[in-house]
């Protein structure tokens, strides 16, 4: 009897009972009861008829045929719509609906924020589709928002913004901008009443438009009488460029009113701009409007505990700063950072946390593998000779809740022999998909007459009674059997053995443990894989062989298997992966997390860094472990409907459980893993209930990958770039406000929703301590007695050169430097660098210094650099008499005339490049020195190993880098995305999306030579995790996980770089016997190369250049050769200045070059190196510290401030000097330029006096760009090739441009009378050009297509005797057919017969 309370206001239209399947369907009239009443009625029926398998209430819809009928029944339409679109209920309850014409309705949201949420949820589309599908009513539905309601919302937003401003202490400019945007204000033209259209709807057919949005790029270009204002604007549907000309007066107003981030409404004409090649808006009217931003208006705020930044490789969009800034704007007190398997956002998050006052919960979403899965589940004491039932099932799908068994196959084993079989189809009473039919070969015709599971399962359990159940991946098969048994009131008490887990422990060398892999390994036939009977038989045969193996290792019973085998380490690289959220509770937890990450990368990496569960258990102190997303253990267990005991074990591992919006996981419906949105909700309800049952906090998390709903387009682009076919079906992984999250979980009930959304996440945030990802302070390594050793080495060398006592100028300089270096704790750096350089020199390799280390006399005297920073001076090598020239008459000592010692008559040494120490370490000596050293590329690995010897293994790591999407790569991703979809968008939209994708992490790498040194009393895990670069598994290189910039000032970084110059010098010394360090730097012939080719004895016309610097490092490029032609340097000092000018950015072009051409200043007066700025300003009487600060800012491209300009003018600094400072983006220190020029000059000396050695060395180093075909053709062949490449201009490929440089040097060599000979199989070296009487003999690897390994193989094998045939050559060298064909082509094998066999005729 149905109670009267249910029958009130309800009309039961129809009742249908299916006896065979025990299903009841009740059809009731639509709108007869609300959702709660229907739910209560459903519960009543389920309690009244417990034997029924399924009870369904179907609501019959009345006919709605007009707009009026829809409006009349709107409240009930909303209720019915909310069953399909749950989130719509909260939206639509607050909205008004109205008729607009015959077939149109408007749904008015009370505020813009609700309108935005409804729009992003595509609610208009949902209503339209619902009315069409349910009532066959085609209506247009438009979402609008109430201006009156918006005013109220705006006031709340304004108050919230003001409160946030106070908390995060915005600067005055920011406050001005905020106040300006609080109300609409006309800036140009007149006020606009017309309704704005979406930018995506702007087309060539559009004439005058009104649009509104956010400016994301702006530029003012000053012309003769007007200013061109150009800006890009977006409303997140698309973007467009806007242009207008302004008067000077309007420009002065607007430049302070609008900027990037300003929201405006505007009107203008849509025109095609030929210059832009796109539609633009010619601006007429412009109005400031309040920012249209999502805000969190809830009094109590949530905390997001699962969020990804752009450090999740090509997967998430926002930077850590953007996330934390948004949390601050919304009033959230904390936010978690949980990137995929990395913590590389931590350093940035730490800085942003300080700036915005938001607590960062540091964490990570890891990839966990359960390395403790038991092989046997249950208590059986059975002997290995006992009974086992090996079985397999086929099903309609993966869910044991929604899917059914369609076949069971089983084999009984006793005494390791098959004694019985069981096989049957099962009628599932639901359709079998084409996918399952294709997989298993089972279709509906094969099962339609089969028995039901109710009949089959008891028989199977009887067959298996008392036996150990055996299956491959038993979790799946057994969970199905137990789930169906439970529905039938049956129990399954058998012990279970999983052959998948057993094989992992017994046969660890297999590539994987799939059934077909095992069958192949054991030579077992598997004829019809994915048929239960065949799979069971194959598994049984495999299992019998495994039983034999178990007995071999001494196992006699089933109960021993776990205890013996689980002691063995399983290969975690072959285990299934689950996601896990790991949050850091305290500093100890942070260190543990760093070690977990490091070990997961170094020991357990396979496609991703894997974390064994046992490792996490061992190191979980100070960590809070969460169950993560749908790829987490808990969610997977519920989808698989695991039995309660296993579920309990899984849940008890976690500190808290996560539930996420159903939209995040709707893709599981498409995959067939769950049936409906309702089932996803049910899983979340179940997780909530389990949390209550096992006393675990349950938190609602967003799995955030982008900030706003419309930002999903960035992730679509990223996913498409990675090749995902479903890239456009993005789940709504945006950062939700408290209201949005409460709305998502309203189905849990108001109290439970508040608990999971607000209370529990805040509880976790409260127990998390303030953690520092990188410790405060500096942690230099310690070398006992470093201070004394540095002082000793320095003074010994100084006395050796300048005598004892030292000249006052030397003594004062050394005292000042040593005090600064030692007192600031930098002696260790110097001692390390000294040891490295000393070892390299002992091993026969010169070391070039880089950067400003040459500014330090201590560095010179300790042997770190050859650059002497003292003023120009003479010093007698015999009696130590010295004379210093401090009147500025010479730029460097090398340029002074020769002079003999007045005391003993010995020719004095000339030295000194006049470089102030302050450039290196500041006036207080507290600027951290950066010692960069150029080692030979051949020697660099040895230098790295020596560093490890000095500090110990585990204390020296390569400096890590993070490779992000550069703007050009990001542009390529965006363009490709739209091209693949045949979509055309405005160039501004391409620009916006490119900007949004730029900076997202793509890979990791290593600094070319940087190493980080950890002091012996510290662990690397106190600072950073470690890993291999670019996830490479085949390298021994270990880098810091954090980008090395993040560790700057914390750990010592040594730059041990590889460079060609020391390699070149070493080869030249070996070929000539000349000691490069003794080459005179004032050699006249060598100096002449920088202005003419006279010393080379060739015609400049034929060479194509009037200077002789081809092939010289730093001076051989076309750009620098042109500088030499313009400046005509005759002194070493001028070469140093040219080096500085040529290596900077915007230092020569459009700057010094114009100043010299216009006669404003000379080469000696322009800014050529950063030192020039500081020294010139000091000479003008400016404060030393301010001069140093200006130099530092200018060399970094920051220019000078207005206040600094006024100070410079006050001291008589000319305008050209100030303007030059403003243009510079980057520039060399003088010491760097000096070191480069010294190396280049030495190589130039060899070019003049040892031409064969010079060219042999040059081409050896540039062998990759060599083309033997062209050069063997002689001068004319080379000239033709040069002309062809030059004719291509900018269209020449990088390879052709590199070849051009090589060909120019080759032409010069021919003009000097030196030729190339052909490659010789027996005489050519593997990789070096050799000097012979006939000319230069190219190496084997100079042949295009013959790699270095093939060349070495040939060179090595010919040492074992001559080749007797091509067959013999092939067999002995093992080179490819291609290499043999290339050697034949060049005549290298012409004397060899094809075969070893002799012919008698």
From Swiss-Prot:
The keyword Nuclease applies. Required for replicative DNA synthesis. This DNA polymerase also exhibits 3' to 5' exonuclease activity. It is found in: Cytoplasm. Its EC number is 2.7.7.7. One of its GO terms (biological process) is DNA-templated DNA replication. PANTHER family: DNA POLYMERASE III POLC-TYPE, DNA POLYMERASE III SUBUNIT ALPHA. Keywords: Cytoplasm, DNA replication, DNA-directed DNA polymerase, Exonuclease, Hydrolase, Nuclease, Nucleotidyltransferase, Transferase. Its main location: cytoplasm. This is DNA polymerase III PolC-type. One of its GO terms (molecular function) is DNA binding. GO terms for cellular component: cytoplasm. Residues 388-543 form the Exonuclease domain. It catalyses: DNA(n) + a 2'-deoxyribonucleoside 5'-triphosphate = DNA(n+1) + diphosphate. CDD domains: DEDDh (cd06127), PHP_PolIIIA_POLC (cd07435), polC_OBF (cd04484). Belongs to the DNA polymerase type-C family. PolC subfamily. HAMAP family: DNApol_PolC (MF_00356).
């Amino acid at each position: 009897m149905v109670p009267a309370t249910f029958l009130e206001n309800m009309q039961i239209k129809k009742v249908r009972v299916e006896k065979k399947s025990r299903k009841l369907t009740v059809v009731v009239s639509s709108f007869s009861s609300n959702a709660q009443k229907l739910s209560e009625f459903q519960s009543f029926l389920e309690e009244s008829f417990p034997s029924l398998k399924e009870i369904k209430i179907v609501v019959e819809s009345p006919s709605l045929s007009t707009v009026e009928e829809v409006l009349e029944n709107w409240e009930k339409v909303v209720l019915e719509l909310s069953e399909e679109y749950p989130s719509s209920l909260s939206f639509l309850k607050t909205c008004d609906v109205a008729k607009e014409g015959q077939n149109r309705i408007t749904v008015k949201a009370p505020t813009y924020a609700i309108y935005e949420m409804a729009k992003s949820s595509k609610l208009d589309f949902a209503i339209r589709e619902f009315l069409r599908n349910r009532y066959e009513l085609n209506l247009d539905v438009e979402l609008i928002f109430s201006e009156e309601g918006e005013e109220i919302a705006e006031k709340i937003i304004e108050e919230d913004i003001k409160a946030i401003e106070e908390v995060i202490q915005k600067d005055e400019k920011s406050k001005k901008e905020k106040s300006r945007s609080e109300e609409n204000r006309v800036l140009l033209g007149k006020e606009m009443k017309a309704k704005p259209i979406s930018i995506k709807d702007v087309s060539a057919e559009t004439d005058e438009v009104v649009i509104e949005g956010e400016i994301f790029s702006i530029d003012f270009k000053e012309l003769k009488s007007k200013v061109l204002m150009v800006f890009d604007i977006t409303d997140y549907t698309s973007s467009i460029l806007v242009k207008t000309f302004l008067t000077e007066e309007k420009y002065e107003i607007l430049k302070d009113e609008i900027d990037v981030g300003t929201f405006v409404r505007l009107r203008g004409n849509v025109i095609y701009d030929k210059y832009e090649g796109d539609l633009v808006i010619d601006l007429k009217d412009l109005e400031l409007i309040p920012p249209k931003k999502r805000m969190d208006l809830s009094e109590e705020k949530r905390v997001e505990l699962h969020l990804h930044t752009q450090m999740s490789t090509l997967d998430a969009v926002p930077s850590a700063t953007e996330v934390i800034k948004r949390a601050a704007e919304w009033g959230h007190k904390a936010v978690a950072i949980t990137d995929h398997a990395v913590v590389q956002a931590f350093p940035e998050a730490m800085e942003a946390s300080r700036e915005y006052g938001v607590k960062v919960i540091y964490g990570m979403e890891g990839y966990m593998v359960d390395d403790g899965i038991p092989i046997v589940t249950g208590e059986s004491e059975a002997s290995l000779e006992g009974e086992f039932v090996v079985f397999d099932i086929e099903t309609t799908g993966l869910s044991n809740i929604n899917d059914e068994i369609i076949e069971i196959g089983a084999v009984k084993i006793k005494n390791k022999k098959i004694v019985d079989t069981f096989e049957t189809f099962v009628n599932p009473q639901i359709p079998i998909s084409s996918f399952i039919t294709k997989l298993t070969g089972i279709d509906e015709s094969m099962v339609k007459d089969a028995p039901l599971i109710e009949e089959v399962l008891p028989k199977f359990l009887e067959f298996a009674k008392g036996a150990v159940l055996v299956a491959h991946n038993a979790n799946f098969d057994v969970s199905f059997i137990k789930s169906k048994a439970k529905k039938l009131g049956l129990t399954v008490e058998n012990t279970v053995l999983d052959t998948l887990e057993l094989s992992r422990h017994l046969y660890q060398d297999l590539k994987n443990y799939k059934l077909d892999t095992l069958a192949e390994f054991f030579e077992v036939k598997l004829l019809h894989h994915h048929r239960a009977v065949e799979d069971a038989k194959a598994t049984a045969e495999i299992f019998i062989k495994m039983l034999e193996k178990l007995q071999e290792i001494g196992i006699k019973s089933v109960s021993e298997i776990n205890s013996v085998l689980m002691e063995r380490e399983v290969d975690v690289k072959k285990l299934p992966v689950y996601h896990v959220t790991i949050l850091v509770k305290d500093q100890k937890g942070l260190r543990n997390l760093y070690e977990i990450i490091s070990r997961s990368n170094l020991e357990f990496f396979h496609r991703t860094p894997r974390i064994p569960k046992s490792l996490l258990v061992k190191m979980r102190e100070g960590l809070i472990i969460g169950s993560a997303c749908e790829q987490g253990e808990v969610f997977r267990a519920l989808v698989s409907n695991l039995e309660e005991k296993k579920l309990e074990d899984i849940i008890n591992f976690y500190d808290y459980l996560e539930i996420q919006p159903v939209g995040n996981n709707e893709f599981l419906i498409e995959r067939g893993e769950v049936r409906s949105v309702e089932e996803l909700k049910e899983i979340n309800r179940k997780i909530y209930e389990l949390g209550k049952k096992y006393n675990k906090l349950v938190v609602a998390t967003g799995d955030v990958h982008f900030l706003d709903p419309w930002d999903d387009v960035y992730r679509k682009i990223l996913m498409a770039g990675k090749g995902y076919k479903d890239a456009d079906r993005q789940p709504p992984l945006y950062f939700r406000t408290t209201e949005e999250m409460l709305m998502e979980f309203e189905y849990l009930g108001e109290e439970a929703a508040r608990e999971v959304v607000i209370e529990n996440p805040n509880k976790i945030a409260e127990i998390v301590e303030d953690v520092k990802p990188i410790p405060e302070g500096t942690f230099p390594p310690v070398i006992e007695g470093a201070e004394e050793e540095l002082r000793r080495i320095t003074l010994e060398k100084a006395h050796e050169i300048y005598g004892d006592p030292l000249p006052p100028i030397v003594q004062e300089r050394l005292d000042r430097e040593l005090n600064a270096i030692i007192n600031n704790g930098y002696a260790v750096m110097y001692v390390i660098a000294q040891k490295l350089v000393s070892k390299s020199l002992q091993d026969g390799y010169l070391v070039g210094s880089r950067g400003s280390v040459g500014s330090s006399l201590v560095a010179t005297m300790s042997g770190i650099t050859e650059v002497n920073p003292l003023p120009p001076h003479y010093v007698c090598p015999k009696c130590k008499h010295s004379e210093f020239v401090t009147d500025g008459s010479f730029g460097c000592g090398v340029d002074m005339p020769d002079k003999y010692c007045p005391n003993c008559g010995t020719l004095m040494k000339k030295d000194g490049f006049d470089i102030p120490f302050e450039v290196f370490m500041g006036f207080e000596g507290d600027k951290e020195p950066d010692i960069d050293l150029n080692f030979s590329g051949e020697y660099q690995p040895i230098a790295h190993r020596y560093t490890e010897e000095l500090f110990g293994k585990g204390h020296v790591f390569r400096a890590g880098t993070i490779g992000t999407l550069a703007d050009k790569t990001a542009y390529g991703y965006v363009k490709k995305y739209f091209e693949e979809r045949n979509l055309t968008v405005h160039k501004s939209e391409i620009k916006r999306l490119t900007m949004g994708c730029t900076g997202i992490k793509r890979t990791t790498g290593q600094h070319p030579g940087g190493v980080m040194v950890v002091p012996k009393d510290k662990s690397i895990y106190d600072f950073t995790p470690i890993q291999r670069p670019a996830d490479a598994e085949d390298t021994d290189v270990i880098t810091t996980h954090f980008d090395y910039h993040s560790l700057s000032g914390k750990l010592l970084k040594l730059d041990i770089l590889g460079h060609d110059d020391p390699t070149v010098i070493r080869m030249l010394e070996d070929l000539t016997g000349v000691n490069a360090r003794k080459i005179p730097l004032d050699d006249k012939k060598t100096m002449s190369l920088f202005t003419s080719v006279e010393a080379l004895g060739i015609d400049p016309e034929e060479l194509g250049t009037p200077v002789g610097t081809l092939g010289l490092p730093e001076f051989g490029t076309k750009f620098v050769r042109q500088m030499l032609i313009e400046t005509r340097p005759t002194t070493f000092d001028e070469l140093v200045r040219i080096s500085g000018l040529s290596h900077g950015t915007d230092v020569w072009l459009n700057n010094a070059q114009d100043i010299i051409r216009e006669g404003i200043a000379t080469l000696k007066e322009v800014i050529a190196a950063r030192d020039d700025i500081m020294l010139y300003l000091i000479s003008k009487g400016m404060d030393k510290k301010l001069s140093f600060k200006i130099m530092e800012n200018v060399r970094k491209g920051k220019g000078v401030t207005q206040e600094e300009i006024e100070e410079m003018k006050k001291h008589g600094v000319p305008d050209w000097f100030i303007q030059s400072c403003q243009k510079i983006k980057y520039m060399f220190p003088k010491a760097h330029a000096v070191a480069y020029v010294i190396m280049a000059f030495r190589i130039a000396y060899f070019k003049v006096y040892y031409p064969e050695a010079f060219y042999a060395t040059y081409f050896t180093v540039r062998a990759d760009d060599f083309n033997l075909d062209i050069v063997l053709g002689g001068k004319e062949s080379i000239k033709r090739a040069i002309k062809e490449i030059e004719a291509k201009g900018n269209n020449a490929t990088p390879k052709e441009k590199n070849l051009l440089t090589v060909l120019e040097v080759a032409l010069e060599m021919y003009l000097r009378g030196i030729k190339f000979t052909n490659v010789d199989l027996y005489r050519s070296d593997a990789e070096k050009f050799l000097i012979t009487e006939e000319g230069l003999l190219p190496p084997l690897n100079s042949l295009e297509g013959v790699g270095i390994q093939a060349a070495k193989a040939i060179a090595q094998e010919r040492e074992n005797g001559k080749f007797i045939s091509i067959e013999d050559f092939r067999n002995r060298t093992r080179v490819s057919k291609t290499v043999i064909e290339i050697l034949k082509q060049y005549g290298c094998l012409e004397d060899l017969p094809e075969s070893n066999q002799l012919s008698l005729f």
